[in-house]
Amino acid sequence: MEKKEETKQPSGSFSEVWDKRGQETDAANDFRKKIEMEITEARPGYAVGEIVVTPWHTNIEGIVHGCVLYSLSDTVGGTAAMTGRDYAVPTVDGTIHYLKAGKNTSKIIARAQEIQNGYAFSVCECKIYDDKETLLASATMTYYHLRKR
């Protein structure tokens, strides 16, 4: 699988480069707020997000729930796919591989890179790490370009 070359990040703070659509989507995203997810960086084709881990995010063994990792990868991947574009990107498909247990970590960080941007679909690879940069999961997410008619 050929990776798309990463674009240079525009200068300025995250809030300066976060486009109007991203701000509106972020303000309306109640689910993201409920699971305490923060998007910390976004530009067309790339995004970073994190969750500060609390007992609410873990199972009885103290391991971050798989659904939390999946939700983080889906949201961060979707942010990468939609930032700078004038259409929504609902998820069509997602595959995640859980590689290590997310245990004894203060936060989880997801980095998503768009690897394909076609007319109708975007595909993003998302890697999720713990606070020590240990790779916990790898996901491939596909999004449909829901254009206005």
Where are these regions (language model features)?
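Terminal targeting signals and extreme-terminal segments of soluble enzymes
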Residues: M1-R149
